[in-house]
Curated annotation (Swiss-Prot):
Short name of one Pfam family: RNA_pol_Rpb1_1
SMART domains listed in its UniProt record: RPOLA_N
Name of the featured protein: DNA-directed RNA polymerase subunit beta'
Catalytic reaction annotation: RNA(n) + a ribonucleoside 5'-triphosphate = RNA(n+1) + diphosphate
Species whose genome carries this gene: Escherichia coli (strain K12)
Length: 1407
């Protein structure tokens, strides 16, 4: 019995490991894996179909073909286990060893491993410091390489051609050693002394100054050190033994008709073996050198093709002209091992079918067809049948189920009760794409889905299919019930708002039910309560819309959370009173006492969840749905062609527009306007006409005139079906109704320009042929766009998930005081996002003080929930510093306080939550709703861009921030600073509006003054940039020489003359070095100093500046000295939508980025070159000045002698995120990326919480470059994981040593994914070959920290419910305990053994 137990133990053994290391395999290692050498290229015998001995499928090397049976048939059965047959040499064991036993081929000549040769940068090339071309010429036998120079003048590693080699031989004889082929490279690698080489390189590194050399040296040092530390030997990159894959992983299967299907690898191996055997024979025969050389080259090519076909030269093709799939192709790409089999597997116990509506289901139920349920729950049914004694064996149970006996259905009912199933709809874009439901057995073959979960699945019933999965184990069922049940996923993880929101019919039903109508039947009655209202409605005595008074009892929570009743008479309608019956206690009546649209219903559910919690909300949602369906049916809302009412004014408006267009056409023909102006004007006219038509149409649809009780006419909101659908938010929008009943309007050509004749017809009137033809482009483009968008959006999601997959909440509080300042998002005159929406669910980083006092309003480390936010709003706080994942100090992962509220649950986040994946899904899921296009700014839009004044909308007081200004002669303020902001503060101290004020703007009101709504507070000339004097005095020209640096121009119309400064390109040789400037002097001719400095007021003028003053005139501060014409920005395309989001997350540099000041100091201009200006910034403290060359065509925002701060904009343009990080720090770049991404999503009306974007930014910032190594082991200029630097520095500081200094790096998401510490994760993402090559050479360890790595090695993930398992494992490892192995008792063992033997004896068990 003991050995039986041993045998079973061997089978249940689980491998415990903490990390996976990858390294180069030495020849001895390859031989130790191998079970024998493959000597022949044969596969199987064509007659017997048995594997050939010593061939690629040899049973002696790889194991038996049949379980427990040797090849010749001498030994069969279990009792001979482990015997090696003396006749055929095959060990008697299970067949599955053919999946794990490897063989090997002894190569007659060494060959280079193509990955280390050709995958850039070439590792062999870097190690030997030889160019790749030279190494290839040596390897493929074109030239010689010197291995030992000896006493000759030949250098080691010198390349010799055939002729040079022969000459050298004649000259030196045997003094030197030169070879060709892989042997040569192997000899060079063998003779390297890595440590000595390292020392030498480090010395060199200290001596050199050139940047390129330093980079190259650092690369080599890193590679050499990696070799030294990992214990890899460089010569192992040259193969002398080739491992052979186990045969069952490269199968040869007989097809019917006597042909065979084989894996491509077999062909590739055959080539290698053939060439290798031929080479051996040639060497034994001592064949001529040239033949041997050719054979060696062919062997090298064969091995290359086996390892990575097509990497060098042309890919080897099979019989059908398609390239053969090599080992490298097996693991990379979507069809490779990683993505096809390790990360995505097919699932047993699953089925799929079409979905239909289940309007009578409860929220936690789904309808499952009986047929499907029977198939999916088979094992449970068999078990129950056997348990009840209804079937003696599993086989009998199987028969019963196949016959579908009556008792089977009863058992099925029992099995299914309380056993949730998972429903999934592809594409699963976020975690709500898989939810758990309790199955309800139904007839038919379609799965029934609850209508309210359609939004989460993005499902509709036009033929969508869904998959069903059965959680088998108890843990899985528990997880499904507790975490994945649809009732537990009411809120969306992306924004924390309800996702179980009624739509379409339900919304229409509720809207119809809560509308009121003038003079409806039963108006003016007073009812005792909702019950009576329903009775009257049902008996036809009152209309649903009748305005009545009803006695309503409301329940409100008091301070202790007890419900208190309050009864009063309310003015309402019958329908609203009936709806009140389903509203849970604790909500105010006011929430149903309005016409309920989709937004109102969503708000109602949200309020219910926040006040009453989960269970009442779920019940309420269900009730809303049933009621909505019922009343939608009763409403009888239908759409007829007469519902699309065309306004009478339409004809008139269109003829007016046509008249205007004709007029402009005449002006154009008489030459008063240019072609471009005419086009823009025509388009403006038609756009305006379209708006007028649609306004007339909406006014017409919106209201109808009725007779009230007193017999007078009264207007009321219309009951037109189309209008009701749009108004309630059930379906359709104003823009769509406009096309039905207004006019279709302007259409675009395929090149994006707008066609100037619009479609004046609408769909009700019908389009004529020309109009229909014009419409086709837009319609088709829409379809093509959608297909592209889906692919792009999916790829963006994949990159986001990959970069963030290992970010998990790992501790409660990291204790940091860092955080980011949150202010409301204000653009121009309106608040885009109020502060409460931004800080809700975040944790405060500092105490929030009551404005104007030192009282603490909210203490530090408070989770801001709804009540706290109300408090902040009451006290009109407009900036709060909150914790953020970007500033979290946790080493691997983040802490719960820095993340804040779990949006989908409404409380602070739990440890182990996979926030990275949630963030990636939340950003990626709405990707398909974003647009794909870059917007061309056409006519109307580009003119609006040149603003020239600020007009406030509300009344309040003005607040200016970072402002420098002077008062001009008329007493107005003139701005002389660059990034001034003007805010409008209301009487509560809240910021209502915010504007940027440019340099040179004249303010009508000063700081702190009161303004009325609609008042203009600042204006400026948008087309020129002024030069403004800060002092008063007299103008003195310097270097302004007519004809050399300036030229005088006279305006024909006004007769005024002005001076124009010449660009340096237009000046004569004498004027090149002159610097035209205006100096301000006092009456005595002395320099006037700029206030607060000791610098004379002197204003240098750039080229093209226009001066309208004469020498010596008197001026006062705030006057304009000169104007610099601004070239209008022209029509720059705005990249919008998905491409913009991708650009931001990939941290791509914009084409012409803004130029920012690298240091703070005084600006001056140095010597110019042909196309560039030299900008010099001299720091005030006298340290080294900073110089930068700027192209001449860039417009500068600064003048000579002006002071700039580090990070200020010197030349306008889109800012590059890397510059923002370098000059303004981590928080600034976070704010920039978050705001830019949010702008794109906000435009589409998609809400995403900021913290998701911050999570991705944290991952983009996870690398740092070492600036100064201090006492650490890092290299200068090396890029290291930020957490590694932090840990190393903490250790160094604890020992009183100097830590390393570093600068944070911003990586794009693709780069960041590939630069992750885990090579398994990186390899499964992209560029598999490169990642694995790099990892192998460095001998990397993968600590299996992320989710992906653990999925790949087949473990629970260290997040969610797997988090505890991993924590426990870590604890055990630390304590040195043995892991809890599955225990096997003797009884179990003998039982399972008996079963095993039965299986072996019983023959075929599967009739």
């Amino acid at each position: 019995m003991k050995d039986l137990l041993k045998f079973l133990k061997a089978q249940t053994k689980t491998e415990e490991f903490d990390a996976i290391k990858i390294a180069l395999a030495s020849p001895d290692m390859i031989r130790s894996w191998s079970f024998g050498e493959v000597k022949k290229p044969e596969t199987i015998n064509y007659r017997t179909f048995k594997p050939e001995r010593d061939g690629l499928f040899c049973a002696r090397i790889f194991g038996p073909v049949k379980d427990y049976e040797c090849l010749c048939g001498k030994y069969k059965r279990l009792k001979h286990r482990g015997v090696i047959c003396e006749k055929c040499g095959v060990e008697v064991t299970q067949t599955k060893v053919r999946r794990e036993r490897m063989g090997h081929i002894e190569l007659a000549s060494p060959t280079a491993h193509i990955w280390f040769l050709k995958s850039l940068p070439s590792r062999i090339g870097l190690l030997l410091d030889m160019p790749l071309r030279d190494i290839e010429r040596v390897l493929y036998f074109e030239s010689y390489v010197v291995i030992e120079g000896g006493m000759t003048n030949l250098e080691r590693q010198q390349i010799l051609t055939e002729e040079q080699y022969l000459d050298a031989l004649e000259e030196f004889g045997d003094e030197f050693d030169a070879k060709m082929g892989a042997e040569a490279i192997q000899a060079l690698l063998k003779s390297m002394d890595l440590e000595q080489e390292c020392e030498q390189l480090r010395e060199e590194l200290n001596e050199t100054n050139s940047e390129t050399k330093r980079k190259k040296l650092t690369k080599r040092i890193k590679l050499l050190e990696a070799f030294v530390q990992s214990g890899n030997k460089p010569e192992w990159m040259i193969l002398t033994v080739l491992p052979v894959l186990p045969p069952d992983l490269r199968p040869l299967v007989p097809l019917d008709g006597g042909r065979f299907a084989t894996s491509d690898l077999n062909d590739l191996y055959r080539r290698v073996i053939n060439r290798n055997n031929r080479l051996k024979r040639l060497l034994d025969l001592a064949a001529p050198d040239i033949i041997v050389r050719n054979e060696k080259r062919m062997l090298q090519e064969a091995v290359d093709a086996l390892l990575d076909n097509g990497r060098r030269g042309r890919a080897i093709t099979g019989s059908n002209k398609r390239p053969l799939k090599s080992l490298a192709d097996m693991i990379k790409g979507k069809q490779g091992r990683f993505r096809q089999n390790l990360l995505g597997k097919r699932v047993d116990y699953s089925g799929r079918s079409v979905i239909t509506v289940g309007p009578y289901l409860r929220l936690h139920q789904c309808g499952l067809p009986k047929k499907m349920a029977l198939e999916l729950f088979k094992p449970f049914i068999y078990g129950k049948l056997e348990l009840r004694g209804l079937a003696t064996t599993i086989k009998a149970a199987k028969k019963m189920v196949e016959r579908e006996e009556a008792v089977v259905w009863d058992i099925l009912d029992e099995v299914i009760r309380e056993h949730p199933v998972l429903l999934n709809r592809a594409p699963t874009l976020h975690r709500l794409g898989i939810q758990a439901f309790e199955p309800v057995l139904i007839e038919g073959k379609a799965i029934q889905l609850h209508p309210l979960v359609c939004a989460a699945y993005n499902a509709d019933f036009d033929g969508d299919q869904m998959a069903v999965h059965v959680p088998l184990t108890l843990e899985a069922q528990l997880e499904a019930r507790a975490l994945m049940m649809s009732t537990n996923n009411i809120l969306s993880p992306a924004n924390g708002e309800p996702i179980i929101v009624p739509s379409q019919d339900v919304v229409l039903g509720l809207y119809y039910m809560t509308r009121d109508c003038v003079n409806a039947k039963g108006e003016g009655m007073v009812l005792t309560g909702p019950k009576e209202a329903e009775r009257l409605y049902r008996s036809g005595l009152a209309s649903l819309h009748a305005r009545v008074k009803v006695r309503i009892t409301e329940y409100e929570k008091d301070a202790n959370g007890e419900l208190v009743a309050k009864t009063s008479l309310k003015d309402t309608t019958v329908g609203r009173a009936i709806l009140w019956m389903i509203v849970p206690k604790g909500l105010p009546y006011s929430i149903v006492n309005q016409a309920l649209g989709k937004k109102a219903i969503s708000k109602m559910l949200n309020t219910c969840y926040r006040i009453l919690g989960l269970k009442p909300t779920v019940i309420f949602a269900d009730q809303i749905m049933y009621t909505g369906f019922a009343y939608a049916a009763r409403s009888g809302a239908s759409v007829g062609i007469d519902d699309m009412v065309i306004p009478e004014k339409k004809h008139e408006i269109i003829s007016e527009a046509e008249a205007e267009v004709a007029e402009i056409q005449e002006q154009f023909q008489s030459g008063l306007v240019t072609a471009g102006e005419r086009y823009n004007k025509v388009i403006d006219i038609w756009a305006a006409a379209n708006d007028r038509v649609s306004k007339a149409m909406m006014d017409n649809l919106q209201t109808e005139t009725v007779i009230n009780r007193d017999g007078q006419e009264e207007k009321q909101v219309s009951f037109n079906s189309i209008y009701m659908m749009a108004d309630s938010g059930a379906r359709g929008s104003a823009a769509q109704i406009r096309q039905l009943a207004g006019m279709r309007g302007l259409m675009a050509k395929p090149d994006g320009s707008i066609i100037e004749t619009p479609i004046t017809a609408n769909f009700r009137e019908g389009l004529n042929v020309l109009q229909y033809f014009i419409s086709t482009h837009g319609a088709r483009k829409g379809l093509a766009d959608t297909a592209l968008k889906t692919a792009n959006s999916g790829y963006l999601t994949r990159r986001l998930v990959d970069v963030a997959q290992d970010l998990v909440v790992t501790e409660d509080d990291c204790g940091t005081h860092e955080g980011i300042m949150m202010t409301p998002v204000i653009e121009g005159g309106d608040v885009k996002e109020p502060l409460r929406d931004r800080v809700l669910g975040r944790v405060t980083a500092e105490d929030v003080l009551k404005p104007g006092t030192a009282d603490i309003l909210v203490p530090r480390n408070t989770l801001l929930h709804e009540q706290w936010c109300d408090l902040l709003e009451e006290n009109s706080v407009d900036a709060v510093k909150v914790r953020s994942v970007v500033s979290c100090d946790t080493d691997f992962g983040v802490c719960a306080h820095c993340y804040g509220r779990d949006l989908a649950r409404g409380h602070i986040i739990n440890k182990g939550e996979a926030i990275g994946v949630i963030a990636a899904q939340s950003i990626g899921e709405p990707g398909t709703q974003l647009t794909m296009r870059t917007f061309h700014i056409g006519g109307a839009a580009s003119r609006a861009a040149a603003e020239s004044s600020i007009q406030v909308k509300n009344k309040g007081s003005i607040k200016l921030s970072n402002v420098k200004s002077v008062v001009n002669s008329s007493g107005k303020l003139v701005i002389t600073s660059r990034n001034t902001e003007l805010k409008l503060i209301d009487e509560f101290g809240r910021t209502k509006e915010s504007y940027k004020v440019p340099y040179g703007a004249v303010l009508a009101k000063g700081d702190g003054e009161q303004v009325a709504g609609g008042e203009t507070v600042a204006n400026w000339d948008p087309h020129t940039m002024p030069v403004i004097t800060e002092v008063s005095g007299f103008v003195r020209f310097t270097d302004m020489i007519d004809g050399q640096t300036i030229t005088r121009q006279t305006d024909e119309l006004t007769g005024l003359s002005s001076l124009v400064v010449l660009d340096s390109a237009e000046r004569t040789a004498g004027g090149k070095d002159l610097r035209p400037a205006l100096k301000i002097v006092d009456a005595q001719g002395n320099d006037v100093l700029i206030p607060g400095t000791d610098m004379p007021a002197q204003y240098f003028l750039p080229g093209k500046a226009i001066v309208q003053l004469e020498d010596g005139v008197q001026i006062s501060s705030g006057d304009t000295l000169a104007r610099i014409p601004q070239e209008s920005g022209g029509t720059k395309d705005i990249t919008g939508g998905l491409p913009r989001v991708a650009d931001l997350f990939e941290a791509r540099r914009p084409k012409e980025p803004a130029i920012l000041a690298e240091i703070s100091g005084i600006v001056s201009f140095g010597k110019e070159t042909k196309g560039k200006r030299r900008l010099v910034i001299t720091p005030v403290d006298g340290s080294d000045p900073y110089e930068e060359m700027i192209p001449k065509w860039r417009q500068l925002n600064v003048f000579e002698g002006e002071r700039v701060e580090r990070g200020d904009v010197i030349s306008d343009g889109p800012e590059a995120p890397h510059d923002i990080l370098r000059l303004r720090g981590v928080h600034a770049v976070t704010r920039y990326i978050v705001n830019e991404v949010q702008d794109v999503y906000r435009l589409q009306g998609v809400k995403i919480n900021d913290k998701h974007i911050e999570v991705i930014v944290r991952q983009m910032l996870r690398k740092a470059t070492i600036v100064n190594a201090g006492s650490s082991d890092f290299l200068e200029g090396e890029q290291v994981e930020y957490s590694r630097v932090k840990i190393a520095n903490r250790e160094l500081e604890a020992n009183g040593k100097v830590g390393a200094t570093y600068s944070r790096d911003l990586l794009g998401i693709t780069k960041a994914s590939l630069a992750t510490e885990s090579f398994i994760s990186a390899a499964s993402f992209q560029e598999t070959t490169r990642v694995l090559t790099e990892a192998a050479v460095a001998g990397k360890r993968d600590e299996l920290r992320g989710l992906k790595e653990n999925v790949i090695v087949g473990r629970l993930i260290p997040a969610g419910t797997g988090y505890a398992y991993h924590q426990d494992r870590m604890r055990r490892r630390a304590a040195g305990e043995a892991p809890a192995a599955p225990q096997v008792t003797a009884e179990d063992a003998s039982a399972s053994l008996a079963e095993l033997l039965n299986a072996g004896l019983g023959g075929s068990d599967n009739e």
